[in-house]
Swiss-Prot record:
High-level lineage: Eukaryota, Viridiplantae, Streptophyta, Embryophyta, Tracheophyta
LRR repeats: 609-631, 632-654, 655-677, 679-701, 702-722, 723-744
Name under which the protein is recorded: Putative disease resistance protein At4g11170
SUPFAM superfamilies: L domain-like, P-loop containing nucleoside triphosphate hydrolases, Toll/Interleukin receptor TIR domain, Winged helix' DNA-binding domain
EC numbers on record: 3.2.2.6
Cited Gene3D superfamilies: Helical domain of apoptotic protease-activating factors, P-loop containing nucleotide triphosphate hydrolases, Ribonuclease Inhibitor, Toll/interleukin-1 receptor homology (TIR) domain
Domain of life from the UniProt record: Eukaryota
Domain NB-ARC per the UniProt entry, residue ranges: 168-454
Domain named TIR: residues: 9-173
Active site positions: 84
Matching InterPro entries: AAA+_ATPase, Apaf_helical, C-JID, Disease_R_plants, Leu-rich_rpt_3, LRR_dom_sf, NB-ARC, P-loop_NTPase
Database matches in Pfam families: C-JID (PF20160), LRR_3 (PF07725), NB-ARC (PF00931), TIR (PF01582), WHD_ROQ1 (PF23282)
Length: 1095
């Protein structure tokens, strides 16, 4: 609901009434009372009543602060009144119009349920009206009657009630919210969300929680809410800093609660000397009062028990709002209505910063890039944005540039003070977990943290993570990833720095590059150090580590020497160490060392505690000899260790789930011990150019992802797992996959691009994606592909010897066949209405094949992705065609107001690449053209001939016509096309356009003078129908032949699928007959002429 304070009001009150019931009695006295009190009321005496309310009445409702709805017995007999009520309730929702129902000699229940005499009048009014209009009236009546109003049974006399209504109106007018919070970015959305949770007009007592991290704006939202609505309650209180008021020294739990209640009631009732002697005081004083209570910054469940233990403590329609960092506190108090305050968007954050830095919503041009950097530095936290913005206000560009590096390394004092409150409230083990995440592990998965962090058990870590999440100190995503806000990470680093300000070697974690280099070079590390995280890109000079550097760091658990910039193999390594430099690290769980400079690990290295070994781009030739105790190892990453010749024995690494050996160009074979990796999920072997040998007959039951890209010497694929989901064999010398592949039950994708495949014999039944690009020796695609029910994408581009493509299953949604130079025949039609086709440079496609492609393009529901195929002219089924790159259609040819969906066709000239296309739609009254972009295909070679490019568009968003548009309908539509690519862009030689029905889904949803059936285009001649039936019979008869071939190629396990497909082929002919009959009716043909072909 938008804030009403932003409106320009003309009236205080808009009355809605049935004149014959109240105009000359009750209403006249009420209006006179309003006038005497200075209440400006809208009068409709001069307006002529009709069946619908006009623009003048709608404007009056929207320009009023309050609407008084006088329900009377005949109110519902007027469609005018009912439409008026709909508009009133709409304004209530959209702009905060206050609605006061008055029930004049009518029961609210009759209005709510449309019963009694009121209901009878309503039913008479509904006669002849649409269902939608009746539904809207009922909803408005019910919603309005649910608002608490004045019932005639509660009136002593009319004169007294008129005075009471007048008084209530004045109170509501005086309660108009101030503008103190109008300029706060995003506040309108926050208030709208809170209003939906509070349900201010509903009965009963409701408690709503606002939770989120410190500094995100919870208190500000609560204050804005209080400011807007406190006048609507008998009593109201904003009790700030509840956390601080609950720590009086020398008091027990009972005494603290008494003290808190006394402070609360004293402020609420404005009685300074009030004394509370028992914990029932709040209930005694407030059980009959409608109160608004804001409890700000609550951090202890006992505080809630003291101030709002039970809903029955408060009167009907009371509302309590609790702000806290701790979600679990709200859950523990059974508060089910909660609002989590999110960080502002990038644009909102920049606006907040600029309001405080420049006193305007956007930065000056010379400081724009710095303002964006400061906004990023603040991590979009509103508190930090306000503090940093105020700090930089009035300073010159040089001061901005000077301040940025300092603020990056140190928290502002005010921001730190606010954020540290949440940290200080943690238990010791939770603080320890917080520091681990802040310094080392932000962005990691929850399971990873359980493996890495030393604790009594996994549950201990899980519980701690949940506490941190509930207190808004971390964010847990659905996929298990753990994130900590940048300012909270900075807080954690500051806490660690203060552990030993002048001796970094005595801190828990080392992260600052300069300080870390000092500790390493001077050998000042101690047993306190648990982790080191050093970005080697920040090392200024070459750093030499001695043999004794790690000697005193006997408790070091995490060693992370990483490079934040891309690693170049020619890059000079600035960190050097002796051969025995790692011999003193028996507790290591994480060893991450990019570009490790030695060829071997020292002989004394003991990796028994290692969970992750990450040595990408290392100089390693060999890790170690013999069998090492690797029982805890989960991840081994040796990616781009180009000198690695041999992998160690991994028989003890039974928990390993990720093994990355990509770009290990000297590696010749995998050890036979790999068979022990029963928990291995990913095996990455891409670009292992010398790899020739993989152990055979091993079954890794957990293996799901397998990459052998560009293992150019690998000729055979081993029987390695039956649970693989992704198999990547790009650029290998493999000629075929093993027979067992057809039994794989989990495989989604097989990619054999640039392999040596000669024939495809075995394909899994559950396959979804099949890539066979650039297999130049491949000549045939097996017919049994049409029986793969999940197959969605096929890519046979650059398979230059493929002559025909078999019938494909209806599940296929993308077929790419670029530069298939020999492709001539397509068996079967493309039945998926959302399929995308790319036949660039398939110049030998026969006429029948092209007809099938055109049929698919004609009937399918496309998107902005274009279908491309050879062709010289726009097909005839595009009703509007033109030479050149634009087309104009006048309204005397078609009613342009009815259509927002189009199919377009371009003829692209030969000799250039298709790099995408810009399309602009001009209508007569568009302020500017609607622009769309047809993206280029991932593979778009030089066009060897003219090509057709076809796709579908919808002009978005559609809008109801304005009065001007109704009086001046569109007279033309112009569409222009311009291909992209600069000097090398394709020429648009012709273009065509076809209007589409808005939501029609049948094959005839296109408005065309032609009818397309079964592969041909027909007009009014029966001979065309005969040709179509012949085509379809030919197609159907080929089904049985294909089934015979498929039966020879398939195992007996596929028989049921084949029989099912045969039945589908039989049913298809019946479907075609039905299409013919429908088409004949559309063309005005007699069904008698169809009998010879439809028997």
């Amino acid at each position: 609901m938008a804030s009403s304070s932003s409106n320009s009001w003309r009236y205080d009150v808009f009355p809605s009434f049935r004149g014959e019931d109240v105009r000359n009695n009750f209403l006249s006295h009420l209006l006179k009372e309003f006038e005497s009190k200075g209440i400006v009321t809208f009068r409709d005496d001069h307006i002529k009543r009709s069946h619908t309310i006009g623009h003048e009445l709608r404007a009056a409702i929207r320009e009023s602060k309050i609407s008084v709805v006088l329900f009377s017995e005949n109110y519902a007999s007027s469609s005018w009144c009912l439409d008026e009520l709909i508009e009133i309730m709409k304004c209530k929702e959209e702009q905060g119009l206050k609605v006061m129902p008055v029930f004049y000699k009518v029961d609210p229940s009759d209005i709510r349920k449309q019963t009694g005499k009121f209901g009878m009048s309503f039913l008479e009014t509904c006669c002849g009206k649409t269902e939608e209009r009746q539904h809207n009236w009922r909803r408005a009546l019910t919603d309005a009657a649910n608002i608490l109003g004045d019932h005639p049974q509660n009136w002593d006399n009319e004169a007294y009630k008129i005075t009471t209504i007048s008084k209530d109106v004045l109170e509501k007018l005086n309660a108009t919210p101030s503008r103190d919070f109008n300029d706060l970015v995003g506040m309108e959305a926050h208030i709208a969300k809170m209003e939906s949770l509070l349900c201010l007009e509903s009965q009963g007592v409701r408690i709503v929680g606002i939770w989120g991290p410190a500094g995100v704006g919870k208190t500000t939202i609560a204050r804005a809410l209080y400011n807007q609505y406190h006048e609507n309650f008998n009593l109201s209180i904003f009790m700030e800093n509840v956390r601080e008021s609950y720590g009086e020294a020398g008091l027990d739990d009972y005494g603290l609660k008494l003290h808190l209640q006394q402070r609360f009631l004293s402020k609420l009732l404005d009685q300074k000397d009030l004394r509370v002697r028992h914990l029932g005081a709040i209930e005694e004083r407030l059980k009959s009062q409608k109160v608004l209570i804001i409890l700000d910054d609550v951090d202890n469940i006992e505080q809630l028990k003291a101030l709002a233990k039970e809903n029955q403590w408060f009167g009907n329609k009371s509302r309590i709002v609790v702000t806290t960092q701790n979600k679990q506190l709200l859950v523990s108090h059974d508060i089910n209505h909660m609002y989590q305050v999110a960080y502002p968007s990038k644009q909102e954050a920049l606006t907040i910063f600029c309001q405080h830095a420049f006193k305007q919503s956007s930065p000056s041009d010379d400081l724009k890039h710095l303002a964006i950097e400061f906004t990023t530095l603040a991590g979009h936290l509103p508190l930090a944005l306000r503090v940093l913005g105020s700090f930089m206000r009035g300073k010159g560009k040089e001061e901005w540039e000077f301040s940025l590096p300092t603020l990056k390394s140190r928290l502002d004092g005010e921001v730190e003070k606010v954020l540290k409150v949440g940290y200080d409230g943690l238990h010791d083990h939770e603080k320890d977990l917080f520091l681990h995440i802040a310094c080392i592990f932000s962005g990691q998965h929850e399971n990873y943290l359980k493996q890495m962090i030393i604790a009594n058990n996994d549950t201990y870590v899980s519980f701690g993570l949940q506490v941190l999440a509930d207190k808004s100190l971390i964010q847990k995503f659905e996929n298990g990833r753990i994130e900590m806000h940048s300012l909270l990470r900075q807080l954690g680093k500051e806490v660690v720095r203060k552990q030993s300000i002048y001796e970094p070697g005595k801190r828990q974690f080392l992260m600052n590059a300069k300080e870390t280099c000092g500790v390493l070079s001077n050998n000042t590390g101690t047993g306190t150090v648990l982790g080191i995280s050093l970005d080697m890109c920040e090392i200024k000079e070459e750093l030499y580590i001695s043999e004794k550097t790690f000697e005193e760091m006997r408790n070091l658990v995490y060693l992370k020497f990483y490079m934040s910039s891309p690693i170049d193999d020619k890059m000079k390594v600035k960190l050097q160490l002796p051969e025995e430099g790692l011999s003193y690290l028996p507790q290591l769980r994480l060893l991450h060392w990019d570009a490790y400079p030695l060829e071997f690990f020292p002989s004394s290295f003991r990796p028994e505690c290692l969970v992750e070994l990450n040595m990408s781009h290392s100089k390693l030739k060999k890790l170690w000899s013999g069998v090492q105790p690797l029982r805890n190892l989960r991840t081994m990453n040796l990616n781009s260790s180009r000198n690695l010749e041999i992998l160690p024995n991994l028989m003890e690494a039974t928990k390993l789930n990720r093994l990355d050996l990509g770009w290990c160009e000297s590696l010749v074979e995998l050890p036979s011990s790999i068979k022990n990796l029963q928990h291995l999920i990913l095996l990455e072997m891409s670009c292992c150019k010398k790899l020739e040998i993989i152990p055979t007959n091993i079954n890794l039951p957990s293996l799901e992802v397998l990459h052998f890209r560009y293992c150019t010497r690998l000729q055979t694929f081993p029987e390695i797992s039956t649970n693989i989901r992704l198999l990547n064999l790009i650029g290998t010398a493999i000629t075929e996959v093993p027979p067992s592949v057809k039994y794989w039950s989990k495989i989604d994708e097989i990619c054999m691009e640039r392999a040596k495949v000669k024939r495809l014999v075995h394909v899994p039944y559950v396959l979804e994606k099949l890539c066979l690009r650039e297999n130049k020796e491949l000549e045939t695609i097996p017919r049994y592909l049409k029986y793969l029910p999940r197959l969605q994408m096929i890519d046979i581009s650059y398979c230059i010897n493929i002559i025909s493509l078999p019938k494909l299953p209806g599940s296929v949604s993308a077929l790419t066949a670029v530069n298939c130079e020999s492709l001539q025949i397509l068996h079967g039609h493309f039945r998926n209405k959302s399929i995308h086709l790319n036949f660039i440079n398939c110049l030998k496609l026969g006429q029948r094949a092209q007809e099938k492609i055109h049929r698919s393009v004609y009937i399918h529901q496309s998107s902005y992705i274009a279908d491309v195929l050879p062709g010289e002219h726009v097909p005839a089924y595009f009703s509007y065609r033109s030479t050149g790159s634009s087309i104009m259609i006048h309204s005397n040819k078609v009613d342009l107001s009815k259509f927002n969906r189009f199919k377009v066709c371009l003829v692209l000239g030969a000799g250039k690449r298709f790099e995408g296309c810009d399309i602009k739609f001009y209508k007569q009254f568009f302020c500017k053209p609607r622009e769309y972009y047809v993206p280029k295909h991932l593979d778009s070679p030089l066009l060897k001939s003219d090509h057709l490019c076809m796709c579908e568009f919808e002009l978005m968003p559609p809008h109801p016509p304005t009065e001007w548009e109704l009086l001046h309908p569109n007279e033309f539509l112009e569409v222009s096309f311009e291909s992209r690519g600069g000097l090398y862009k394709c020429e648009v030689k012709e273009c065509g356009l076809q209007f589409l029905e808005p939501h029609e889904t049948s094959e005839f949803r296109y408005l065309s003078p032609h009818l397309y059936l079964g592969g041909s285009w027909i007009g009014n001649s029966s001979s065309s129908i005969e040709e179509i039936i012949h085509v379809d019979q030919e197609e159907s008869s080929s089904d049985s032949e294909e089934i015979i071939y498929a039966d020879q190629e398939e195992s007996s396990s596929g028989i049921e699928e084949i029989i099912h497909a045969e039945r589908e082929g039989t049913n298809r002919r019946k479907s075609v007959m039905r299409w013919i009959k429908v088409g004949a009716r559309k063309m005005g043909l007699s069904l008698e002429c169809l009998k010879p072909w439809t028997r």
